[in-house]
């Protein structure tokens, strides 16, 4: 098998992990990197997609959904994560909301120095808020999504999944 195929993160695998965790709502800000996952989520009858105009609003919406008994996940990019600091502090951490933030790690690379400050500051940002995180780069890492959900439940805190690769087209 071609190593390039093995090393990809397929949207089907990510969606499968979300379904295994019983996710009911995806609160997200659409972007070009999540297009393939979006097409699958849109067709999935067990998911409700909640689009937000700014990432900071995702935190309060997800907190309300969780308080009402739903099981949301937040899907945003790292730049939006950093824009959302006060909402994370007040809504998620302040209210003990056990939620997974799936964060696109824009600008990150395993192949040499990271040149984009969006990627450079993501981990220090998460550390400042004491938010634990898991890196998911390919399908072999997908079980870390379940680990993040388990940890969020156990700690009643947000936990991040850093998506270190763009979702690739349908692998069918």
What are these regions (language model features)?
Residues 1-172:
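Thiamine diphosphate
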